[in-house]
Amino acid sequence: MDVNLAPLRAWDDFFPGSDRFARPDFRDISKWNNRVVSNLLYYQTNYLVVAAMMISVVGFLSPFNMILGGVIVVLVFMGFVWAAHNKDILRRMKKQYPTAFVMVVMLASYFLISMFGGVMVFVFGITLPLLLMFIHASLRLRNLKNKLENKMEGIGLKKTPMGIILDALEQQEDNINKFADYISKARE
């Protein structure tokens, strides 16, 4: 299946006003995780544009450190995903605590980058865009169109870059399993 970039959402949909933002329920981690995953899939192109602008500014000021930081983060992420596929304890951690898994990847990347002296580039060029994405995805309430797009991604009708990353973090399998269970119950 071809990988397609999701459409760029309108600014008034991305930042509609305070009525479409709410604090997540920190007691219900699965509901909060579902909101974050749904928003990451739905607004992925908007997040990509915001991150690209921030990375471009930092990359313009310090291109070598930005490239080095990006390469280190990608290699550490791929290493942790590979290790999680081969070690059961890491796989469970990645599936149950995806935020902690990403934080471990970022901390490991930070320590590697600090050896090369590019800590400020890491903080402003890599960590800040990821933090802003996570905050927006946590606070933004989902709408009906968001939920419909996510179902299409979840059952495999569409494949996007963020969907591939979330699959690597094993954050979409539950949605597919729930949908398959729903269809099998509807047939009975």
Curated annotation (Swiss-Prot):
TM annotation in the entry: 40-60, 64-84, 93-113, 115-135
N-acetylmethionine: modified positions: M1
Keyword Endoplasmic reticulum listed: yes
This protein's UniProt keywords: Acetylation, Cell membrane, Cytoplasm, Cytoskeleton, Endoplasmic reticulum, Membrane, Transmembrane, Transmembrane helix
Signal sequence range: none
GO biological process terms, semicolon-separated: cellular response to oxidative stress; glutathione metabolic process; intrinsic apoptotic signaling pathway in response to oxidative stress; L-glutamate import across plasma membrane; L-glutamate transmembrane transport; learning or memory; negative regulation of L-glutamate import across plasma membrane; negative regulation of mitochondrial membrane potential
GO CC terms, sorted: cytoskeleton; endoplasmic reticulum membrane; plasma membrane; presynaptic cytosol
Predominant localisation class: endoplasmic reticulum
Keyword Transit peptide assigned: no
Induction: By methyl-beta-cyclodextrin. Up-regulated upon chronic morphine injection, in amygdala only, other brain regions remain unaffected. Induction by morphine may affect glutamate uptake in the amygdala, causing mice to develop morphine tolerance and dependence. Was originally reported to be induced by retinoic acid.
Region of interest: Targeting to endoplasmic reticulum membrane: 136-188
Expression (tissue specificity): Expressed in the cerebral cortex, cerebellum, hippocampus, olfactory bulbs, medulla oblongate and limbic system (at protein level). Ubiquitous.
Stretches the record annotates as Required for homodimer formation and heterodimer formation with ARL6IP1: 103-117
Membrane topology: Multi-pass membrane protein
Top-level taxonomic group: Eukaryota
Record topology, Cytoplasmic segments: 1-39, 85-92, 136-188
Protein location: Endoplasmic reticulum membrane; Cell membrane; Cytoplasm; Cytoplasm, Cytoskeleton
Function: Regulates intracellular concentrations of taurine and glutamate. Negatively modulates SLC1A1/EAAC1 glutamate transport activity by decreasing its affinity for glutamate in a PKC activity-dependent manner. Plays a role in the retention of SLC1A1/EAAC1 in the endoplasmic reticulum.
Family that this chain belongs to: Belongs to the PRA1 family.
Subunit structure: Homodimer. Heterodimer with ARL6IP1. Forms multimers. Interacts with ARL6. Interacts with prenylated RAB1A and RAB3A. Interacts with SLC1A1/EAAC1. Interacts with RTN2 (via first transmembrane domain). Does not interact with VAMP1, VAMP2 or VAMP3.
Designated name of the protein: PRA1 family protein 3
Gene that encodes it: Arl6ip5
